[in-house]
Amino acid sequence: MPIKVEIAPEQFEIPKGVFVETVSSVQHYTESLFQFRITRPASFRFRSGEFVMIGLPNAQKPVFRAYSIASPSWDEEIEFYSIKVPDGPLTQHLQKVQVGDSVLMRKKPTGTLVNDALLPGKRLYMFATGTGIAPFASLIRDPDTYEKFDRLILCHTCRQVAELRYGHDLVAALKDDPLVGDLAAQRLIHYPTVTR
């Protein structure tokens, strides 16, 4: 039975320990990749690089999956980058979200790919395939990362050139970022590659 993402929060039971947030933007990059942003609760704290469980409201028990947070810890919204899995318990419905839809988010983020777990050094190498770039998207937009490393090297590999667009857009937007723009211009190296 398909999940209806249009259900208003007052029409379903909200599980304990869950925020109900609103989709603020959606961008489809390819037939298999998309990015979306949701509102951020004032009480939600996370460290750049962490992940959180998200789901969609429905009449039955919601299905939750772990998603890396692609936005930095200082951002006023929460960004996610996802693959579209046609028969995925969550992604088959999540890929259809639109601005204004509700998304469920557990209140406790977690993860170890965070700045305070990284030892300072000359270079930070970040190797990602596909949507695995999401936690690195968070880290390269965090000023703390640039305080710990002289050079950040982001290697992003996908099957086809079109699948690299999120990474290209991300790095291009860093130039205008008021917090890390100058640092990223001097220290961030982006190596996009394809396998086909």
Residue locations for each model-derived region?
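Ferredoxin-reductase
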Residues: 4-101
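FNR/FR-type flavoprotein reductase catalytic core
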Residues: 89-196
